[in-house]
């Protein structure tokens, strides 16, 4: 398994990295502002209203996160009962409730060159693999080796990995099993 300490340490690094990226404007060209209408509830009165809001940054970063604060959080509870063993997953090392979307433009290299578009990467293929429902989030452990084998690649051939940092336990487990440093 993945220890609580490792999960909390990873979560701290993730929060710090996101905070630094936001502070330094690293994501400004990656996030397109989106204006929507949002229901807002006044906590004191319960009054609901619809207000316009523009989302222009990831709102889920907690830049003031500390390791001491993470270690002080209690394991997640569900209906008053600990989930499974309930020892390690907390609000600090697990995903928050959030909405999001993404898009990716894929085109032929010749078309990109003709249009003076500099590719950010190469799409080599994809693979899918299943796992048990209670093993949510560890699909890469099964799919990545298939994909690498199909293309004659090794983990060390990949410059940048995205394993979804929603849950520290999940990303650390996947990285450990796949041998991603």
Residue ranges with predicted function:
Residues 26, 41-46, 133-140, 165-181:
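Short glycine/threonine-rich loop-to-helix capping motif typified by GTGT followed
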Residues 112-116, 145-160, 178-179:
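Phosphate/pyrophosphate-binding loops at sites that engage ATP/ADP/AMP, CoA/4′-phosphopantetheine
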Residues 9-114, 179-181:
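N-terminal extracellular/periplasmic Venus flytrap/periplasmic-binding protein-like
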Residues 118-124:
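Short helix-loop-beta-strand segments that form the rim/entrance of peptidase-like active sites
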Residues 1:
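Flexible glycine-/small-residue-enriched beta->alpha junction loops
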Residues 18, 103-108, 140-147, 171-174:
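Buried hydrophobic packing segments
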Residues 5-11, 86-102, 124-150, 159-165:
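Active-site pocket-shaping loop/turn-to-helix segments
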